């Protein structure tokens, strides 16, 4: 990057707007606009993380009742890319039927979203990483989608817990050596700059592509 995208007292991403919600993956129009999606269990802090990355307080709706998000919510960032808040899955208060429906919607999206470039898999650092999440990581690699494992709420871990988490991360990276993992605390801001840079780098890629098209035409 040739310039600092964030000046003092300015948000990292200046132009952010909610665009649309979809109840089914096949309703999403193919626009050729790159997407970064946020997936994870209903209590992992997906929507809070999206708001923190974009430095907006309530862009993505955060509910006190986990599992409320049932739609694919699209946010247009810097006139370049979409950030997609996916429905949460796996919350214990939801029925098995609800869980299957949300997982089905997620997998349909992964299979049909040709513009999806990166998936932020958001996981509470206080919890074990279930097999479903590991399978999602593998699915991303198979489809040439960059997975980023985001371990949230690390401010709630003591040093002993943090040491245990790092050991578990090492085991996961032995399974997926190319996996990028970011430890995040919305409270302290730790890890947010790394995630913003991933988003910004994709915006720069789009910007450079458009400039090349203009030069050719």
Swiss-Prot record:
Domain EngB-type G: 32-205
Residue ranges the record marks as coiled coil: none
Pfam families referenced in this protein's UniProt entry, alphabetically: MMR_HSR1
InterPro entries, per the entry: G_ENGB_dom, GTP-bd, GTP-bd_ribosome_bio_YsxC, P-loop_NTPase
The protein's required cofactors: Mg(2+)
GO MF, one annotated term: metal ion binding
Keywords: Cell cycle, Cell division, GTP-binding, Magnesium, Metal-binding, Nucleotide-binding, Septation
Domain of life: Bacteria
Entry GO CC: cytosol
Binding site for GTP: 40-47, 67-71, 85-88, 152-155, 184-186
GO terms classed as biological process: division septum assembly
Record-listed Mg(2+) binding positions: 47, 69
Keyword Metal-binding: yes
Gene3D superfamilies in alphabetical order: P-loop containing nucleotide triphosphate hydrolases
Family label: Belongs to the TRAFAC class TrmE-Era-EngA-EngB-Septin-like GTPase superfamily. EngB GTPase family.
HAMAP family named in the record: GTPase_EngB
Role summary: Necessary for normal cell division and for the maintenance of normal septation.
Listed name of the protein: Probable GTP-binding protein EngB
